[in-house]
A protein has these predicted regions:
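Short conserved loop adjoining the S-adenosyl-L-methionine
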Residues: 88-92
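C-terminal alpha-helical "lid/dimerization" subdomain adjacent to the S-adenosyl-L-methionine
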Residues: 128-170, 177-178
């Protein structure tokens, strides 16, 4: 766990950092995800602190994450989470899959993950990715600190997506809806 950045030391530090970064858009962001999920069964890839669960209304939820601290914390709260690397493990079939605040971690293999998720999503894939990032700051000190805080392992990508880049990804995968949520860009890719 030494190679994990501060954001991933514990779900409490993760949520605190998220609330600081999102500010007044924090709730709006999760409400938009919940609206798009609807009453579908859901699988969250790289589920982190499983915050989206608090915004769901009786959905069947499962999460996958590579961080044992996050997985153990979620399990203690009774949340269905498994310790898995989504790039090497099979992704179970479910109505709705979300990739939330984590696509950058898979760069330059992010499209491979999207294809893999689409194969397992029965109804839709929702991707919500930050496009306003301190890790992309022109101030080298700020960008260094932000990348250090959010690193996942020794091979973490320093890459963060711009709004234009995420729009291109969503267009490539024929997203039916794209919505800006104050910091994130959310795309909904339906299977219908």
């Amino acid at each position: 766990m030494k190679e994990m950045g501060l954001a991933y030391w514990h779900p409490v530090t993760y949520r605190l950092i998220e609330k600081i970064l999102y500010g007044r858009n924090y709730r709006k962001h999760y409400e938009a995800l919940s609206r798009e999920i609807g009453d579908s069964s859901i699988l969250e890839l790289c589920c982190g602190d499983c915050q989206v669960v608090d915004y769901l209304k009786g959905n069947t939820y499962q999460g996958l994450d590579i961080n044992p601290r996050f997985v153990n914390h979620a399990k203690k709260k009774g949340i269905n989470v498994s310790l898995q690397d989504v790039m090497v493990s099979e992704i179970p079939e479910v109505e709705c899959i979300i990739i939330h605040n984590s696509l950058y971690q898979f760069y330059p293999h992010h499209e491979k993950l999207i294809y893999k998720a689409l194969q397992s999503a029965q109804k839709k894939l929702i991707i919500s990715e930050p496009v306003i990032n301190l890790a992309s700051s022109k101030n080298r000190i700020i960008s260094f600190i932000a990348r250090w805080i959010t690193r996942v392992g020794n091979n973490s990508s320093a890459k963060r997506f711009s709004r234009k880049e995420m729009e291109e990804v969503f267009n490539k995968f024929h997203a039916e809806r794209i919505e800006f949520l104050g910091r994130n860009l959310m795309g909904v890719i339906s299977k219908n």
